[in-house]
């Protein structure tokens, strides 16, 4: 276990602001609001912020706010928040927006992890060192952004999620105010950081990230983590003690929560993360059915290293049109490969709406590079939204050319091991268990696969339908969710699930 040696810039302001509010009587204290982002990282960190402020300010009535339509940013009109202290987490506030808010008497404490400008984002009437006073009137409003992405911050911690940056802020608060590392050492808190690293697709291969994944994978699954797991389990969940492992997060937990946001059920998502249970309706199934319908109408324009997907409004009801743009990023993700990125965009009678970019290689800053060609991408390096996207042949050609150049510098090879007998391989701990466990700590495009080189006549299909197949190979179960894959053209992915190796025929050899 290791701590952040040098606190992020602005944490001292964070501590002083909370201490200032804490020193006031409740009836004299200015109104406080916690503003979260509409995704798993945003809600988990919003809950953590609420718990922290409720405890420190001895006030269990602090309100929160989350945007509709999975919109990322600060959208509450500033005139409605004059005199407020707004604690924001997991979304960007740029310098111009900060200046506007502060000029209108709104005090802002922002904790973020998205790419940002090179200089510290702050705005206040007084000199920097004077921000440490109790400033509650509109003339003395102030705002600042704590962010691990500033170039002056420790690069070893750039992987952190919004919850991760907040973890350091609150942990440093307790260390300085109470001389305690209990919060920093708390396994559930660290597990929540690990959960958001996975849900937000952060660079989990960075050395400092592993401790948070360890906390998640080895958590006893009690208390709040246990609640999250049990709430999203389906009735047909198979045997074995459920746990928040990589596959569970990727294929059960994240889809369950994200589907609520996509159908504009943010209130249900907030209620779930805040501890009030998951809704009875199966939104994950509704999501799959809606995506399949959308895929029946999309138009793809494919280039060597980039695919453009137009999602038309064809056949959609007015209600469906109100949330279809929330599915753009998901559709883009379904067509990404190790050598291909995707831009998906919505169109309604010639008017273009939300667009999203998705790529699988985090070592390339696609957002920065493609923004140089005229895009207005907002978000992370390889997963972000695009504002005011206007498709054209000229734009497509220029983006394809740049993506081809970017991929030319990437030496990504699929790592796989030839395995002649699955049963012997999986029962050898140094092979089966170790490889399956290590894959839980690797980015998708760095995972280790298996190529079956044994006797194909020993493979028996046990059951399946048009969506999946389950095979027995040397007496070992192998699942497959793409019926175009075979053991001749595909590779097997070993992962740990419920503490034991599981196998899935997961990708084409030449993909």
Name the predicted role of every residue range.
Residues 442-467, 489-494:
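Structural detector for short beta-strands of small beta-barrel domains
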Residues 509-511:
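Extended, charge-rich, solvent-exposed interface segments
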Residues 471-487:
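Beta-strand/loop nucleic-acid-binding surfaces
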Residues 110, 162-164, 192:
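Acidic, glycine-enriched active-site microenvironments
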Residues 92-160:
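Histidine/acidic-residue-rich, glycine-tolerant segments that coordinate divalent metal ions
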Residues 2-87, 100-106, 125-133, 140, ...:
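Hydrophobic helix-and-loop "lid/oligomerization" segment in the mid-to-C-terminal part
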Residues 485-506:
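Flexible glycine-rich surface loops and low-complexity tracts that mediate binding to linear polymers
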Residues 158-168:
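Short, glycine-/small-residue-rich phosphate/pyrophosphate-handling segment
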